[in-house]
């Protein structure tokens, strides 16, 4: 009895020390309670991804006994390689290793894909929670994890919500470069994402955010307060932790206000940086919402045959060109699983004028 009590007391003493180490902000890398969840999940996802990318056997992604190879050992390279999504025969079923009769069956049906994405999604949620936790411990505001929620929402949209809406994890995004582009083409063909307002907002956020970032960085760099001689780098004029401003915001404000107009320039550094953070974040949120709506087939606008003349004859537009391109991509997608999409059998084909008429 004495020995057992001593062992339990030593364990109880070790637990508070472990808790203190986990939540300590003095560590070189903060762990946190969310990190306790994040680290093993991301490690499991990364290890399985690397092994599957190198050596996974072909996967019967369409469920028609025609496996698709995605690993290095089966002839792929860094561009064409991917972790192929789980089989359409599995659908939305949870498919851990113990659900398969053999390991070969699990690999053939694309089990590694589910293992990677589930651990990855839990891991990035843990990373987001860890960002909030560290901000809380340091007395900071929580906006860092709010900004990070944008890519988290995008990952959940393509890896979880979209397969749920389409009815199978085989419709999820493959984990590879060519697989990602294939996913984008198929998404355009089936949902016309280019004509969805939320996708347009996402494009505006990405390009606009890049533009604003470049503008802000160049303005700050151009209005630095010189603390060095002409022969030294201006970077040496900054000391980490200094209280003085490192650039002249009045000069930057005046330059940009005269370049465009006065009210296009921020005169408040805090509101400026909040805008730089929130603009791309909100736009990526909207894009994720668009993916989630299209997952349930609430698709982008279709302007096919939308313009007619006084006689009721269709006037071909670029909307018809886009629709024809979508049909072409849809025909090529899963061409062995079905002969052609029903869209092609719905109506007679209409010619699209892409060449100028001959004159004379």
Curated annotation (Swiss-Prot):
Q: Where does [CaMn4O5] cluster bind?
A: 171, 190, 333-334, 343, 345
Which reaction is recorded as catalysed by this protein?
2 a plastoquinone + 4 hnu + 2 H2O = 2 a plastoquinol + O2
Amino-acid positions noted as binding a quinone in the UniProt annotation, renumbered to this chain: 216, 265-266
Could you state a single Gene Ontology molecular function term? oxidoreductase activity, acting on diphenols and related substances as donors, oxygen as acceptor
Q: What induces it?
A: Transcription decreases upon iron starvation.
- Which residues are involved in binding chlorophyll a PD1? 199
Site, as annotated: Stabilizes free radical intermediate: 191
Subcellular localization, as worded in the UniProt entry: Cellular thylakoid membrane
- What Gene Ontology terms for biological process does this UniProt record contain? photosynthetic electron transport in photosystem II; response to herbicide
Task: Provide the propeptide boundaries.
Answer: 346-360
Where, in this chain's numbering, is pheophytin a bound?
Answer: 127
Where is it mostly found?
membrane
* InterPro entries hit by this protein: D1/D2 (IPR055266), Photo_II_D1/D2_sf (IPR036854), Photo_RC_L/M (IPR000484), Photo_RC_L/M_CS (IPR055265), PSII_D1 (IPR005867)
> Per UniProt, what is one Pfam family of this protein?
Photo_RC
- Positions of chlorophyll a ChlzD1 binding: 119
Site (Cleavage): give the residues: 345-346
Topological category with respect to the lipid bilayer: Multi-pass membrane protein
EC? 1.10.3.9
How does the record describe the protein's post-translational processing?
A: Tyr-162 forms a radical intermediate that is referred to as redox-active TyrZ, YZ or Y-Z. C-terminally processed by CtpA; processing is essential to allow assembly of the oxygen-evolving complex and thus photosynthetic growth.
Q: What else is known?
A: Cyanobacteria usually contain more than 2 copies of the psbA gene. 2 of the reaction center chlorophylls (ChlD1 and ChlD2) are entirely coordinated by water.
* Quaternary structure note: PSII is composed of 1 copy each of membrane proteins PsbA, PsbB, PsbC, PsbD, PsbE, PsbF, PsbH, PsbI, PsbJ, PsbK, PsbL, PsbM, PsbT, PsbX, PsbY, Psb30/Ycf12, peripheral proteins PsbO, CyanoQ (PsbQ), PsbU, PsbV and a large number of cofactors. It forms dimeric complexes.
Function field: Photosystem II (PSII) is a light-driven water:plastoquinone oxidoreductase that uses light energy to abstract electrons from H(2)O, generating O(2) and a proton gradient subsequently used for ATP formation. It consists of a core antenna complex that captures photons, and an electron transfer chain that converts photonic excitation into a charge separation. The D1/D2 (PsbA/PsbD) reaction center heterodimer binds P680, the primary electron donor of PSII as well as several subsequent electron acceptors.
The protein, known as: Photosystem II protein D1
Q: Which organism is it from?
A: Prochlorococcus marinus (strain SARG / CCMP1375 / SS120)
Primary gene name: psbA
